[in-house]
C-alpha cells in the first residue's frame, strides 16, 4: 500500500522508501524510515499536497512523492495518537540488533577513539561558537538574546539565509557567536546546507558548536546532533522551548540522555533568555577542558554496514592526508551514503581515486547481502534513528495526551478545502485595506506637520535660493515620502504576524499545487510573500529552494511583488484619484503583480529553464503566538531602515533633483516683472482680476522655468518613449530617478510640484492635491485616473531598485540575469501601462 492511498485520519507504518537522489535522501533524513508510524492529518484545498504527522512534527508532501513510500495500514480513519509513541521504539531493522548503547561508555571503539577525539583548544579569551539547529527551533531568538542583536525571527523555514555574527562578553571570555542558517541535516541538499557543512569542515571550523534543539520534537532534531558528533565537533545542546515541553506533561531525564550521548544539555527558553547564563557557563567549561560529560560516541551501523565502515576508515587513515580535521570514520560513512560533495572532496585528494574504488567495492559487497528494498543509505539512516529511539526509550516518557492540539484545530480551518483560499485572500485584503485606512490618520498628522514646517520656513526665512532649497528640495522631497511611514509600519505588522505565527508555512502549503503548475516549488511562495516587505531579503531567501531552475525563476519574478518602497507611490496616487476605493486599488495592484509573476514563471519555465520536478517536502511548524517584542523589533528595524533611507539616498536625491530643476534660472524674469507691473497699474481691472491674471502669469512662467531647467530638458528628451502611455516629462523624470529607490519617485514629484507656487498656503497643500490639479501650459490636466493607474502599474513592474538588481546578480552567480531582469521588467512595464492607458481612454 502506498502512502498516497491513505485517507485523512489513517495511520500506517512505513515499510520502505523508493525513488532515488535528493528526494530519497531528504525524506529518509526527515524520519521516513522503516518502522515509523505516520498519520494523515489533512489535504490542501486543491487536494495536493497532503499534511502528515510523523515523529511528533508536521510535514507536507505532494501525492506523487507520497506514492514512492510503501506503508502498512494499522488504523483506518482513526483519531491520531501521539506521534511520540515512536519515541522509545527502535527501528525494526533486521540487519542489526546492536545499534543502541544502553551503557553510556559502551560501544566506543578504542581503535577509533583517537581518530574522533574532540580537541578543545583554548583560543586566548575569545571562543568562536557556531549556532546550528533545525528550522523553527528558536535558534535566532537565542542569538538575539545572547548578542543583543535584533535579527528577524520567524516561525517558518528560511528566515536565516546567511551567517550572522555577534560578539558579547560572558565572564572572562568574549564569545563570538555565528548564527548559521537552519538545516535538517549536513547533507548538501540545498545551498545553505552545503554552506553549513563547508563552514564546519574547513578553516572556518568553530571552537564549539551550540546545537539548538526543539525539546518538543527531540527525535527529529537529534538526527542533526548525531551528524555533528560524527564530524568530531565539540557539541553542546540547548534544549530550547523547554517551557512548551513542560506544558505537554511529558517526562524527560535529560541528564541521563546527556551522559548517554556524551553531550552537555541545558534547558533554555530563547524568547525570554531563561537558561542562557547556564548555557554559556557550560560552553566555557568545555572550552577550558573542565566538563566531564563531553566525549566521543560511535554508532554501530549493523552487521552488514559496520565492517565496510571500519575497512574503509582504515584505508582512509592509511592513504589520505586530509587538509582539515575531519574524522576518517565520518568520511567513510558519507562515502557509503553516496554523498556527492564528499565524493568530490575525496576525489580531489592524493590517492582519493583509490579510496573511491574501495568504496565502490564495499558497496557491491553490501548489495549482495541486502534485499532489493534496502541499500546502504537507508540502513545508515535507519541506524541513526534507531540509536536515537533507543536512547529516548531510556530517558523519555510521553504523557499520551489527546493529540487534537490548537495547531490541529486552527489548521482544520485555515487549510480547509473550501475555506483555505478565501481566508488567505481575505487576510491579504484586510492587510492592504488596513494599510491605507488605518494609516491615513497618522499620515494626515505627519503631513500636516510637514506642511506647517514648510509654511514656517517659507514665512520666516529670507527669500533666496537657500530658502527654495529647504522648502522645495528638503521639505518637499523628504517630507513627501516620510508621511507614509505609518502605512509601511502597518504593512510590516501584518507580515510579521504571518511569519511569527506559522501561517506563512501554511500559505505555502495551500499554494503548492498552483505554484507547481507555474513551474515553481511550493517554497517559492515564501520568498514571493516576503517580497511584499522588501525584494532584497526575498531574493536571498530563494536559497532555501533546492531546485536551481525554480530558484532562478523565483529570483526573476520576485521583483514583481510590490515591496514597501512602492507603497508610498500607490498611496499617493490612489489617495489622490481613488480616495473612496484606495484599499481596493492597492489590493488590485498587488494581485496584478502576483498574476504577472504567475504568467512569467510559466513563460520562463517553457523557454529559459527546463525545471526538474523537485519534491515538496516542508515542515509545518506549530502555531505560536507572536510576541510583542518580536513584532515591535521587526517593525522598529523596518522603521529605522526607512528613516536611514530618508536621511541618505532620498535626501541626496531630493537635493540633486532640486538643483537640476532650479537651474538655469528663468531668462525672461525681467519681462515677467514688467508684465506684472502693467497688470497692477491697470485701473480698468479690479483686484480679483489682477490676482487671477498675475497667478496665471506666474504659473506659465514656472512651467517654462521647469521645462528650461536641466531636469526639464532631460525629461523632454526621454518623454517621447513614454508619451504613448500618457506620461509627461515630470512623470518620466520621476520614473528615471526612481531606479535608485522607488521612494525617490515620490520625492521627485514632491520637489517638482512643491515649487509650483510661491504662496506658502499653496505650497503646504497635500502633494496629492497638487498633482491632481496640475495643468500644462494649455490649461489641460496632466494627470487623470487612467494615467494614475498606468503610472502605478509602471512603478509596480519596471526596473527593480539597484539593491535588488545587485542581489539578483550575486544570488544567481551571473550578472547577465541582473541585466535580463532590467530589460524584461522595463519592457513589460511599458506594454502593460500602454494597454491600461489606451484601453482606459476608450471607455473613460
Swiss-Prot record:
Q: Segment Disordered: which positions?
A: 79-110
User: What happens biologically when this protein's gene is inactivated, per the record?
Assistant: Cells do not transport Fe(2+). Cells are avirulent and therefore unable to cause lesions in mice.
Q: Which UniProt keywords apply?
A: Cell inner membrane, Cell membrane, GTP-binding, Ion transport, Iron, Iron transport, Membrane, Nucleotide-binding, Transmembrane, Transmembrane helix, Transport
Boundaries of each FeoB-type G domain copy?
Answer: 126-289
Family matches, as Pfam families: FeoA, FeoB_C, FeoB_Cyto, FeoB_N, Gate
What is this protein's record name?
Fe(2+) transport protein A/Fe(2+) transporter FeoB fusion protein
Similarity comment text for this entry:
In the N-terminal section; belongs to the FeoA family.
User: What's the domain of life for this entry?
Assistant: Bacteria
**Chief site of localization:** membrane
The coding gene here is: feoB1
GO cellular-component terms in the record? plasma membrane
Q: Which GO terms describe its molecular function?
A: ferrous iron transmembrane transporter activity; GTP binding; transition metal ion binding
To which species is this protein native? Porphyromonas gingivalis (strain ATCC BAA-308 / W83)
Query: Which residues participate in GTP 3 binding?
Result: 179-182
Record keyword Cell membrane present: yes
Keyword Cell membrane tagged:
yes
Amino acid at each position: 500500500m502506498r502512502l498516497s492511498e491513505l485517507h485523512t485520519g489513517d495511520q500506517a507504518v512505513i515499510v520502505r522508501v523508493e525513488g532515488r537522489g535528493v528526494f530519497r535522501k531528504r525524506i529518509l533524513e526527515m524520519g521516513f524510515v522503516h518502522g515509523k508510524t505516520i498519520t494523515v492529518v489533512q489535504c490542501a484545498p486543491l487536494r495536493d499536497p497532503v499534511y502528515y504527522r510523523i515523529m511528533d512534527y508536521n510535514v507536507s508532501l505532494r501525492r506523487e512523492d507520497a506514492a514512492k513510500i510503501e506503508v502498512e495500514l494499522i488504523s483506518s480513519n482513526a483519531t491520531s495518537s501521539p506521534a511520540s509513541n515512536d519515541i522509545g521504539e527502535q527501528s525494526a531493522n533486521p540487519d542489526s540488533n546492536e545499534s543502541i548503547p544502553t551503557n553510556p561508555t559502551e560501544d566506543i571503539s578504542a581503535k577509533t577513539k583517537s581518530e574522533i577525539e574532540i580537541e578543545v583548544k583554548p583560543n586566548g579569551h575569545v571562543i568562536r561558537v557556531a549556532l546550528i539547529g533545525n528550522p523553527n527551533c528558536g535558534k535566532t531568538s537565542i542569538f538575539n538574546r545572547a548578542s543583543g542583536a535584533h535579527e528577524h525571527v520567524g516561525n517558518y523555514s528560511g528566515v536565516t539565509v546567511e551567517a550572522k555574527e555577534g560578539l558579547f562578553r560572558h565572564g572572562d571570555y568574549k564569545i563570538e557567536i555565528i548564527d548559521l542558517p537552519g538545516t535538517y541535516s549536513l547533507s548538501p541538499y540545498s545551498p545553505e546546507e552545503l554552506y553549513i557543512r563547508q563552514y564546519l569542515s574547513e578553516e572556518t571550523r568553530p571552537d564549539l558548536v551550540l546545537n539548538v534543539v526543539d525539546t518538543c520534537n527531540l527525535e527529529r532534531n537529534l538526527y542533526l546532533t548525531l551528524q555533528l558528533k560524527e564530524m568530531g565537533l565539540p557539541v553542546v545542546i540547548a534544549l530550547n522551548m523547554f517551557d512548551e515541553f513542560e506544558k505537554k506533561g511529558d517526562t524527560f531525564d535529560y541528564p541521563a540522555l546527556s551522559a548517554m550521548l556524551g553531550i552537555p544539555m541545558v534547558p533554555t527558553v530563547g524568547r525570554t533568555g531563561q537558561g542562557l547564563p547556564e548555557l554559556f557557563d557550560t560552553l566555557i567549561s568545555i572550552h577550558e577542558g573542565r566538563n566531564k560529560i563531553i566525549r566521543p560516541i560511535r554508532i554501530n551501523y549493523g552487521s552488514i554496514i559496520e565492517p565496510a565502515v571500519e575497512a574503509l576508515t582504515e584505508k582512509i587513515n592509511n592513504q589520505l592526508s586530509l587538509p582539515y580535521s575531519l574524522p576518517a570514520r565520518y568520511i567513510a560513512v558519507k562515502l557509503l551514503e553516496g554523498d556527492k560533495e564528499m565524493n568530490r572532496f575525496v576525489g580531489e585528494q592524493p590517492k582519493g581515486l583509490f579510496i573511491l574504488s574501495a568504496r565502490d567495492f564495499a558497496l557491491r559487497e553490501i548489495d549482495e547481502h541486502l534485499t532489493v528494498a534496502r541499500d546502504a543509505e537507508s540502513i545508515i539512516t535507519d541506524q541513526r534513528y534507531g540509536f536515537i529511539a533507543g536512547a529516548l526509550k531510556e530517558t523519555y516518557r510521553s504523557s499520551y495526551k489527546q493529540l487534537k492540539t490548537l495547531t490541529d484545530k486552527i489548521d482544520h480551518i485555515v487549510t480547509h478545502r473550501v475555506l483555505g483560499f478565501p481566508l488567505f485572500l481575505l487576510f491579504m485584503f484586510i492587510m492592504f485595506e488596513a494599510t491605507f485606512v488605518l494609516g491615513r490618520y497618522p499620515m494626515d498628522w505627519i503631513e500636516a506637520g510637514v506642511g506647517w514646517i514648510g509654511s514656517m520656513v517659507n514665512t520666516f526665512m529670507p527669500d533666496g535660493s537657500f530658502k527654495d532649497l529647504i522648502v522645495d528640495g528638503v521639505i518637499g522631497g523628504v517630507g513627501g515620502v516620510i508621511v507614509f511611514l505609518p502605512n509601511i509600519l502597518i504593512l510590516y505588522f501584518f507580515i510579521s504576524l504571518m511569519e511569527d505565527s506559522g501561517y506563512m508555512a501554511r500559505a505555502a502549503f495551500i499554494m503548492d499545487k498552483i505554484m507547481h503548475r507555474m513551474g515553481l516549488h511550493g517554497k517559492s511562495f515564501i520568498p514571493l510573500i516576503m517580497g511584499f516587505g522588501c525584494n532584497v531579503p526575498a531574493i536571498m531567501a530563494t536559497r532555501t529552494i533546492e531546485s536551481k531552475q525554480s530558484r532562478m525563476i523565483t529570483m526573476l519574478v520576485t521583483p514583481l511583488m510590490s515591496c514597501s518602497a512602492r507603497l508610498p507611490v500607490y498611496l499617493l496616487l490612489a489617495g489622490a484619484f481613488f480616495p473612496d476605493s484606495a484599499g481596493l486599488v492597492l489590493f488590485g495592484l498587488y494581485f496584478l503583480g502576483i498574476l504577472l509573476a504567475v504568467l512569467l514563471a510559466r513563460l520562463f519555465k517553457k523557454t529559459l529553464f527546463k525545471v526538474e520536478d523537485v519534491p515538496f517536502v516542508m515542515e509545518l511548524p506549530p502555531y505560536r503566538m507572536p510576541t510583542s517584542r518580536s513584532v515591535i523589533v521587526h517593525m522598529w528595524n523596518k522603521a529605522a531602515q526607512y528613516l536611514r533611507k530618508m536621511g541618505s539616498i532620498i535626501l541626496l536625491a531630493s537635493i540633486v533633483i532640486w538643483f537640476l530643476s532650479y537651474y538655469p534660472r528663468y531668462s525672461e524674469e525681467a519681462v515677467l516683472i514688467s508684465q506684472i507691473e502693467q497688470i497692477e497699474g491697470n485701473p480698468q481691472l479690479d483686484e480679483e482680476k489682477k490676482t487671477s491674471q498675475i497667478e496665471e502669469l506666474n504659473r506659465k512662467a514656472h512651467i517654462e522655468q521647469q521645462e528650461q531647467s536641466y531636469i526639464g530638458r532631460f525629461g523632454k528628451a526621454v518623454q517621447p518613449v513614454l508619451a504613448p502611455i500618457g506620461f509627461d516629462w515630470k512623470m518620466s523624470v520621476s520614473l528615471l530617478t526612481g531606479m535608485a529607490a522607488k521612494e525617490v519617485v515620490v520625492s521627485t514629484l514632491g520637489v517638482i510640484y512643491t515649487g509650483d507656487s510661491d504662496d506658502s498656503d499653496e505650497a503646504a497643500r497635500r502633494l496629492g492635491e497638487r498633482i491632481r490639479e496640475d495643468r500644462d501650459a494649455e490649461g489641460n490636466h496632466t494627470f487623470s485616473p487612467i494615467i494614475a493607474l498606468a503610472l502605478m502599474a509602471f512603478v509596480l513592474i519596471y526596473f527593480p531598485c539597484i539593491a535588488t538588481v545587485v542581489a539578483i546578480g550575486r544570488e544567481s552567480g551571473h550578472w547577465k540575469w541582473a541585466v535580463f531582469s532590467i530589460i524584461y521588467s522595463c519592457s513589460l512595464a511599458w506594454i502593460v501601462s500602454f494597454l491600461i492607458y489606451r484601453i482606459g481612454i476608450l471607455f473613460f
